[in-house]
Amino acid sequence: MDPRSEVLLRQAELFQGPLLIAGAPADDLLGQLPQAQAWTWHAGDQAMLESRFAGRSHYGVEAPEAAFESAVLFLPKSRELAAYLLNTLASRLAGRELYLVGEKRGGIEGAAKQLAAFGKPRKLDSARHCQLWQVTIDQAPQAKPLESLAERFELALEDGPLQVVSLPGVFSHGRLDRGTALLLKHLDGLPGGHMLDFGCGAGVLGATLKRRYPQSRVTLLDVDAFAVAASRLTLAANGLEGEVISGDGIDAAPTELSLILSNPPFHTGVHTNYQASENLLKKSAVHLRKGGEMRLVANSFLRYQPLIEGALGNCQVRDEADGFRIYQATRG
């Protein structure tokens, strides 16, 4: 069980009524708290929770409409996302309890200071390198529309400026990361057809593909609901059409793809997690058509080339700069 869940269950008597668990991990916490419901924005966690606790988990960027008497937020990595979620929960809990649980290395002590905007926070427990905080909502805020927190910026690309809309919690929020910047220089000569932007984030790569290859069908895929929402906003801001879907890794992707383009993720919260990226590389041949291509950027220290060669039988390094490599491989 997640150590944060274990800390929560040390105070289980506080959580016996209708409770919303925001950012709920995919463990047995719902099984221990029979009146609780989960809210998650991670498609993989949603699939696991729904399979074990059918009808008790909500997926998306908005809180579920069902009533709850108290709520607990599992602290996310992003400070901006934490602020949005705390505000959203507090807006529905006037005079009631809001809890915050998180790891010390994830910044729980600093994040707990945000609770002071709603009342007088107090620390209830500290164990398993985690802390549990509580506040009674004396001053319920107005709920903020998610789009009001969007960061909008413009990228100067070869074929003209691209408008990007990023949301709290999305990778490289409000800026272009160095890996994607390098990959944007290597989008020439791609095979047309059905293109996939895997781990799309704010949709920079997918939007660029659709503009450069307008006759191709472009699908953008991410595990995170906030990334899916941001990608849709980015496409709309540029007058582009594309399919944006949520799913847990490459298994959720279409088949017969002409291209897989990616700056694959390797973090889950504050933890390093290479599973999604390694699955992408190992299973790429299942999703590419014959002659289809995979082109991706990754940190130079990651040993991805042998995995790509094992899956597709070939791999070349197109470029290397600023600690990143561009890999290219074709399904024979």
Swiss-Prot record:
Keywords: Cytoplasm, Methyltransferase, rRNA processing, S-adenosyl-L-methionine, Transferase
Annotated compartments: Cytoplasm
A GO MF term: nucleic acid binding
Signal peptide segment: none
Source taxon at top rank: Bacteria
Pfam families on file: MTS, MTS_N
Catalytic activity: guanosine(1207) in 16S rRNA + S-adenosyl-L-methionine = N(2)-methylguanosine(1207) in 16S rRNA + S-adenosyl-L-homocysteine + H(+)
EC number: 2.1.1.172
Alphabetical list of InterPro entries matching this protein: DNA_methylase_N6_adenine_CS (IPR002052), Mtase_sm_N (IPR013675), rRNA_ssu_MeTfrase_C (IPR023543), RsmC/RlmG (IPR046977), SAM-dependent_MTases_sf (IPR029063), Small_mtfrase_dom (IPR007848)
Keyword Methyltransferase: yes
Quaternary structure annotation from Swiss-Prot or TrEMBL: Monomer.
UniProt family annotation: Belongs to the methyltransferase superfamily. RsmC family.
Name under which the protein is recorded: Ribosomal RNA small subunit methyltransferase C
Organism of provenance: Pseudomonas putida (strain ATCC 700007 / DSM 6899 / JCM 31910 / BCRC 17059 / LMG 24140 / F1)
